[in-house]
């Protein structure tokens, strides 16, 4: 019996739980039922309101329907009246249009005739111009074709010339000369093209350009080129070999010492020499660096500076600035010397002007004495003779000579003290 007690307790507990669940479920259902009842009541009220609104709208619809029928009847009456008016107007317009059509047809015929004649005339003129222009165009095309063929042959000739070593060298020299001329430097004063000299061992050197810089500085430019620079094919090995040969040749020529020695013989003192290797294009510089990345370091090690047109223009701008500044300094000294000469000339002119003034004073004084004596002695006797009945004929004698006097005075110079009372001396 004891083992049945737990089972009975469990069953009892289950029954109690079921009762509680049923109770809760019933309460929930009652609540939902109450909610649904209230909601149903609300829906019923809404339906009644909607039915009332429906009745009101139906009444309005009936009223609007009556109005529409009245308006339709009015429209029909208006349409009937309009049709009758339109028929009357149509008949009148038809008669008027018939007359206008006749007139317009006559005018149109006349205009068509005139327009056809004018069009035929314009077409004939345009055809003549077109034919002449077409003939001229054919002639121009033929001439242009000949020019293109000649230009093609010329371009081929230039290309072949540039692909030769001599042509490439001439291109670099021409480019260098054009840059120097356009830089603002003075030919044969600030720079010299194709300067030739002979060394002590009878070796002839000819740098392409010498630029004379202030303070005893000298810039030597030697243009170098290779046919591989203008060739579109990839010849990096040949280009590197050629440009390294040019660099070695330029370094072995020792322009610096030989040019300094040659210029010193001509009593031109220069102490420092800058050597530039000029390449005709910036693309040429890039090609050389791409062919031999160590080319610039090799050149700098030999105190040689490879440059293209842009680099050369920058260096020439700086050189022009130095030359202009040096020229301004020299002109400054010349101006001071000229001012000294001018001041000396002013002193000489002042002496001469003083002498001229003294001479003028003496001349006017003597003239005044002469006029006084003439008026007092001579003219009085002339008047006495005229009183005796002797006239001068057609000539009218003056009553007296005018007298002049010179008033001399010393100029007073008013000196105004400036902020800096001591004048600044110009340093020579």
UniProtKB/Swiss-Prot annotation:
PANTHER family: DNA RECOMBINATION PROTEIN RMUC. Involved in DNA recombination. InterPro entries: DNA_recombination_RmuC (IPR003798). It holds the Pfam family RmuC. It comes from the Bacteria. Belongs to the RmuC family. Keywords: Coiled coil, DNA recombination. It comes from Rickettsia bellii (strain RML369-C). This is DNA recombination protein RmuC homolog. The keyword Aminoacyl-tRNA synthetase does not apply. GO terms for biological process: DNA recombination. The keyword Coiled coil applies. Residues 25-80 form a coiled coil.
């Amino acid at each position: 019996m004891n083992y049945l007690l737990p089972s009975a307790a469990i069953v009892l507990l289950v029954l109690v739980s079921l009762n509680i669940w049923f109770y809760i479920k019933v309460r929930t259902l009652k609540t939902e039922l109450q909610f649904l009842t209230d909601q149903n009541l609300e829906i019923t009220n809404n339906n009644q309101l909607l039915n009332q609104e429906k009745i009101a709208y139906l009444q309005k619809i009936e009223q609007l329907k009556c109005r529409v029928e009245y308006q339709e009847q009015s429209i029909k009456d208006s349409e009937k009246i309009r049709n009758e008016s339109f028929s009357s107007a149509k008949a009148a317009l038809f008669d008027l249009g018939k007359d206008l059509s006749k007139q317009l047809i006559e005018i149109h015929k006349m205009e068509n005739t005139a327009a056809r004649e004018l069009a035929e005339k314009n077409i004939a003129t345009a055809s003549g111009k077109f034919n002449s222009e077409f003939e001229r165009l054919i002639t121009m095309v033929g001439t242009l074709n000949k020019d293109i063929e000649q230009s093609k042959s010329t371009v081929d000739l230039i290309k072949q010339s540039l692909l030769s070593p001599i042509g490439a060298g001439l291109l670099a020299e021409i480019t260098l000369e054009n840059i120097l001329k356009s830089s603002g430097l003075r030919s044969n004063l600030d720079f010299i093209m194709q300067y030739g000299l002979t060394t002590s061992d009878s070796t002839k050197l000819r740098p392409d350009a010498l630029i004379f810089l202030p303070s005893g500085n000298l810039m030597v430019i030697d243009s170098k080129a290779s046919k591989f620079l203008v060739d579109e094919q990839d010849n990096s090995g040949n280009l590197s070999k050629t440009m390294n040969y040019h660099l070695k040749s330029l370094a072995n020529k020792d322009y610096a010492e030989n040019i300094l020695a040659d210029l010193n013989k001509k009593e031109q003192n220069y102490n420092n020499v800058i050597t530039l290797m000029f390449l005709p294009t910036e693309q040429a510089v890039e090609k050389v660096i791409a062919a031999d990345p160590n080319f610039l370091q090799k050149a700098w090690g030999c105190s040689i500076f490879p440059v293209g047109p842009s680099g050369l223009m920058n260096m020439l701008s700086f050189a022009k600035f130095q030359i202009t500044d040096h020229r301004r300094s020299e002109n400054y000294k010349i101006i001071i010397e000229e001012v000294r000469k001018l001041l000396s000339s002013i002193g000489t002119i002042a002496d001469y002007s003083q002498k001229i003034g003294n001479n003028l004073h003496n001349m006017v004084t003597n003239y005044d004495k002469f006029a006084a004596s003439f008026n007092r002695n001579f003219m009085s006797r002339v008047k006495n003779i005229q009183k005796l009945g002797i006239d001068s004929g057609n000539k009218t004698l003056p009553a007296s000579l005018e007298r002049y006097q010179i008033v001399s005075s010393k100029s007073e110079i008013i000196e105004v003290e400036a902020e800096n009372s001591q004048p600044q001396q110009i340093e020579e």
